[in-house]
Amino acid sequence: MNRNTILVATMAVATLGTTTQSCVALATSSVGLAVLKQILLGGITKGLNIFSDKNSFLANELIEAALPQQLKDVNSTLQKLGLNSLVQKEKEYIAQAATFTVDVSRPILTNAVNSLTAEDAARIVQGGSGTATQILKEKTSEQLMAAIAPKVDAKLNEFGLVSTLNNALAGSNLLGTLLGGQSSNALTGGISKFASQQMVNGLFNIIQSHEQQNASTIMNSLNSIK
């Protein structure tokens, strides 16, 4: 065998080895992403199932933890006035409104999960537990707010939440002071906005909790995509 033949054969073996490694890496990357997506979709399903049930929504600590400061201030003021029952009614109205956001939230989140890339996976490996949810939040939070806020606003208007709160506060304009608005539309929009924020952030809290519970599975599946 002459020198040229040996050189060509060596190059062929090297090329074959590189191609094989690339195929293995590609296949492993696909498997790792599939595992990641499956876990995130599981977290989304878990969260939206909670949103679908008023009592589950009310009882969930991760959703309660997402309550914006403005609504905390409203509730604190009502409680100081001895209106605990009204605080509970407000929470129930928000929980009922949440059930109407499930159908618009699901496709937004599902599409975002299905569009995750190997670059996203590499960032998750570097960032550790919770990073996948953070990426999902970056991709979808604005879109979710835009999609669910009108539904929340319509339901809270239907329930007459603002007028109920204003009547309870006897025209003192405390609600306007707390929410930074004066008109009825501003007050309704304020409560709807903050309720929508609670829903979006509460949903991501649930997804992140699910991700963290499955952190070792995710990391093991993505280690080959570093």
Where are these regions (language model features)?
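Bacterial N-terminal signal peptides that target proteins for export
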Residues: 1-9
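C-terminal motif of bacterial Sec signal peptides marking the signal peptidase cleavage site
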Residues: 18-22
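Post-signal-peptide N-terminal segment of Sec-exported extracytoplasmic proteins
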Residues: 38-79
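A glycine-rich, hydrophobic loop/mini-helix early in the fold
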Residues: 64-96, 100
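A cross-kingdom marker for long, charged
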Residues: 193-226
